[in-house]
């Protein structure tokens, strides 16, 4: 039997259908409130609003659970590779061996970008942020694929593959241009993560030998950042897509949203915070500053809009961070890691943070890993965008298959 919630306005009662979730909280359908009750609901920041139906990602923030298509994020990070997870998000199931091989071949086939795109990079000044370059380059792909300006259902999967394939190439090109080095073409004999590292760090006169520990760590980071429900950038992609905008334009809006320091830029801010703290001896002083409402200092990398428990992605990255630094001989003498570990230990025992459920999030350790790999801080958000592209494309594809989809129009 159908269940209803009752809303009483000015003495009149309105019945609102309660929709049963397959997992997690049920929702109240308020879509008819404005038409029937002559008023609107008000929810700043969409704190209590579900904007769509989705079967891609599930989060239980109280229990610290994150699942993609029913698979636990820790299992995916430990047992899968990034393109397996990409296939899972886009198609709904993990691939068979044959499906995986075909998928990886298709991604490799589309990894090149049009040579004319190289000229776009030359229009930027040498000090341009890689995210600014990437944002423009991804949007410009619309000019190279005019046949996709009005996507049909048959094009959705090919579009997703093209985007997944070209994003790391554009990301590496953005980095190379920002440091004045020539672009490095993709090498289709390498897997996805190896190829990105190759394009980042090889030069025409020096080959780059991929360290398997580094590759595996980056693979985990990509998986952990692949999708995360209807966050700011994903919602931006969906809103842009709801108007019928082409997929390249939609992804560029996601990149723009991700660039914000409260979203994708947080791991860079964590590095700056750890540098500011400077040493373990200063941690108590900065803990006190974080508690002081009148002090502008804030502990970055703690707390999350959804998680009221330990972020499961942070748990994986903490161990991955130790593996990378051990491989690079930095485990015992990396000052940022030592500060981070001690800061976490102190915060997790402090009643102030416990009461407010402020636990380390995914940004707390990822920046330390990137820095140890030799990836500069201005590239941190670029790498986030590479990973999140598969989530954006899966959400974009799902949105176009939703019979209830309408153009987004908040009041």
Swiss-Prot record:
**Protein origin, superkingdom:** Bacteria
Annotated membrane-spanning segments are: none
The enzyme's first-digit EC class, named in words, is transferase
The answer, when asked if Transmembrane is one of the entry's keywords, is: no
Q: Tell me, what is an example of a GO biological process annotation in this record?
A: tricarboxylic acid cycle
- Keyword Cytoplasm listed? The answer is no
Q: Which reaction does it catalyse?
A: oxaloacetate + acetyl-CoA + H2O = citrate + CoA + H(+)
Protein family per UniProt:
Belongs to the citrate synthase family.
Q: Which PANTHER family match?
A: CITRATE SYNTHASE
Protein name according to UniProt: Citrate synthase
